[in-house]
Amino acid sequence: MDASSQYSALPYPQPPRVPSAAPSAGRLPWSRVGEIVIFTFVSVLALYLLWLWVLKDCILLLKAQRGRSTEELIFGPGERPPVASADGSRPVPDPSPPVRRDLDLSRV
């Protein structure tokens, strides 16, 4: 037997094969999962900011156009109906102090 035919000068008869990518197992790659998570986060943030800056004001505006002012929507009705007394004689007026509209703030 000839020793030169059995052994070559190179350690490997052929260069080793290096796989270009891992075989797919039918699942999403991690980069795609990361893209989906980032897209979901940005979408939720955009919807929250849209609600905070635009949609809430539009709803208040539509309710105010139906006859109620925005102050009534936020703070409740401006005037309360009188409360009936326990003995039924006459209604008791609202205990809150009246608003003074005669103050002139231009002299301050």
UniProtKB/Swiss-Prot annotation:
The chain crosses the membrane at residues 35-55. One of its GO terms (biological process) is transport of virus in host, cell to cell. Residues 1-25, 73-108 are annotated as: Disordered. Keywords: Host membrane, Membrane, Transmembrane, Transmembrane helix, Transport, Viral movement protein. Residues 99-108 have a biased composition (Basic and acidic residues). One of its GO terms (cellular component) is host cell membrane. Pfam families: Gemini_mov (PF01708). It is a single-pass membrane protein. It comes from the Viruses. Involved in the viral transport within, and between cells. Interacts with the capsid protein (CP). Part of a MP-CP-viral DNA complex. This is Movement protein.
